[in-house]
Amino acid sequence: MAVAHTPVARTAANPYKVFIAGGCYSGLAAAINLLERCDSNAENPIPVAITIVDERDGFYHVIGSPLALADKKYAEKAWVEFKDVKILQRPDVQFLHGSVTKVDTATKTATLRESADLHERTETYDFFIGATGLRRAWPVVPQALTRKTYLIEAGRHIDAVTSSSDPVLVVGGGAVGIEMAAELKTVQPNIKVTLAHSREKLLSAEPLPDMVKDCALELTRAAGVECLMDHRLTTSKLIKNAAGQDAYEVEFENGHKMTASVVIVAISKSVPSTDFLPKEALSEEGLVNILPSLQLANKDIPNSESHFAVGDLINWSGIKRCGGAMHEGKYAGLNIHQIMQHELEGKEVKLNEIGEIPPMIGLAVGKSAVSYGPDGMNSGPQVMQVFFEEDLGFRICWDHLRLGGDPA
């Protein structure tokens, strides 16, 4: 593969500058795998300087949101400030708390707005990785941008759902709604939890066979959640219940009415967080068009081969999953290392490429889970253990990314 770079000797004073927008699963995977490869030749390591920008001040385990919004102890665990991500505490990595507002691919310059004072600054780079994911609404994910305010936000939510005699209503029977309802019921078994979905089957928006959707319903009911199918919410009005507490009078399109202590709307049209990229790089939905090598697909964009995109923001097949995001981040890191080696040593570039991703899912439902992929469907407590363990996959992801490992 031809790469349009002019070889320049690299030293500690003139390292390769890599700018990563987004510090979750895919962004951290890219950084860690790239550093590992650059350090692999102890006698002649490749000097790099990595900048990771994120709106949050830490790694937040997004998969764990349903449990983080049901259990205060777990909420403390699910958000780890970047200063406590051990493997990346090294002089060639800097974390910036802020948001990327613009990327100029021609000059290889990123503009970002710092969270502390809204000051705008620019950073130049040799390689760019977009890993900012999708913007998801509350309460699908917390909206707080610091660990401190997140714990307050999560705590208030948990207090609200645990302090009333009326049932908690979760609206939306996609993966998030199912997991939120089931986690809440499992952690707080004394609360009545109702899940309402506008369609005949749960997971109706996903390209999954009916047996998976039916199994999800069976497991949700077995977890103790009341499921209302074909119930589309029309109105939700704040009232005082019989005990004088704030509650909601809810009405559905079919005429069914109920009183709920809290209404959790788990229907979220997630929006790609890609405004900072050139329009020419994006699909109509705002996802990033990529080559299988994870580089920008549009060759008319200046320096497209130096710009990568990974994780939920890419326009690619498959259901958005953190396993895929970590894999893509790894490949982006390895591919950037390949290009560096080509520049420095003239080595032939052999880029790693992702393949088409078939529909697959792992869904936690209380103490059980259902999984589906090319090998078919499995369900039960043993699936929960394999896919999520006791903490909705926190340890699995933390250890897979090696976030607690020693920095090189």
Feature locations, PLM:
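C-terminal, flexible cofactor-proximal segment of oxidoreductases
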Residues: 98, 319-324, 328-408
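FAD-binding core/adjacent interface of flavoenzyme oxidoreductases
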Residues: 2-21, 40, 90-169
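FAD-site-proximal beta/loop scaffold in flavoenzymes
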Residues: 147-165, 257-327
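Glycine-rich Rossmann-fold phosphate-binding loop(s) that bind the pyrophosphate
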Residues: 22-25, 172-174, 318
